[in-house]
């Protein structure tokens, strides 16, 4: 590369970054691809916004039944731009779900789930389930009336399953009733377990797309 900087030369000598850049920039894009093929990428952007704003809120949120609501109120009223961070988190969550639904419809209607891309479809559906679970667990964290009763209803749904229903309810709630153990479980799922799960499946999803390319037109 002509007129390259010393920093570029240093990385190029060790990592051959030009080959990586060439591979990314010269990847073939089929002529039938249009704006609707960007929905998956927009979903990724929403996830990154969720990660950044969620991480920022963990500095102020207190996952206890006694302090959860007041910590959210403190974030909204006393923390500089706290209201903006939480609002962006909520709106990007809604946008992520919307973009995900549209992306699933686009893939289905264009036949992107067919052979040899079945595993790409499976990882995508798995990510859709995780994304919805994000919404369920995050809804409870303010521990207000809406969040409390939402958790009580959602965690009680598995009770209808024969044999293992009651066990699943206690597993979700951390006991027979909704309380501190429930909030702790939902907080752990929302801020640690699900982000890592989603990141792993997202990496698998992107690697398969990279390997197989974009599906052709119907």
UniProtKB/Swiss-Prot annotation:
Binding-site list for heme b 1: 103, 205
Membrane topology: Multi-pass membrane protein
Binding site for heme b 2: 89, 190
GO cellular component, one term: plasma membrane-derived thylakoid membrane
SUPFAM superfamilies, per the entry: Transmembrane di-heme cytochromes
Subcellular location: Cellular thylakoid membrane
Main location: membrane
Cofactor binding note: Binds 2 heme b groups non-covalently with two histidine residues as axial ligands. Binds one heme group covalently by a single cysteine link with no axial amino acid ligand. This heme was named heme ci.
HAMAP family for this protein: Cytb6_f_cytb6
Assembly with partners or alone: The 4 large subunits of the cytochrome b6-f complex are cytochrome b6, subunit IV (17 kDa polypeptide, PetD), cytochrome f and the Rieske protein, while the 4 small subunits are PetG, PetL, PetM and PetN. The complex functions as a dimer.
Family label: Belongs to the cytochrome b family. PetB subfamily.
Additional facts recorded: Heme 1 (or BH or b566) is high-potential and absorbs at about 566 nm, and heme 2 (or BL or b562) is low-potential and absorbs at about 562 nm.
Descriptive protein name: Cytochrome b6
Species whose genome carries this gene: Parasynechococcus marenigrum (strain WH8102)
Upper classification of the organism: Bacteria, Bacillati, Cyanobacteriota, Cyanophyceae, Synechococcales
């Amino acid at each position: 590369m002509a007129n390259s900087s010393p920093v570029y030369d240093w990385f190029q000598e060790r990592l051959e970054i030009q080959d990586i850049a060439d591979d990314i920039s010269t990847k073939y894009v089929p002529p039938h691809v249009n704006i609707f093929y960007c929905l998956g990428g927009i979903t990724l952007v929403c996830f990154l916004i969720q990660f950044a704003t969620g991480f920022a809120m963990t500095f102020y949120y207190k996952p206890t039944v006694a302090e959860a609501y007041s910590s959210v109120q403190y974030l909204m009223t006393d923390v500089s731009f706290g209201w903006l961070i939480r609002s962006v988190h909520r709106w990007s969550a809604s946008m992520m779900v919307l973009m995900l639904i549209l992306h699933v419809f686009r893939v289905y209607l264009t036949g992107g789930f067919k052979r040899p891309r079945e595993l790409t479809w499976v990882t995508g559906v798995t990510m859709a389930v995780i994304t919805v679970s994000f919404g369920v667990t995050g809804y409870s964290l303010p521990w207000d009336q809406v969040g409390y009763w939402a958790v009580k209803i959602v965690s009680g749904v598995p009770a209808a399953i024969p044999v293992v229903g009651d066990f699943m309810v206690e597993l979700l709630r951390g006991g027979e009733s909704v309380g501190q153990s429930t909030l702790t479980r939902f907080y752990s799922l929302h801020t640690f377990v699900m982000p890592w799960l989603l990141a792993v499946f997202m990496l698998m999803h992107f690697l398969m797309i990279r390997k197989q390319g974009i599906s052709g037109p119907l």
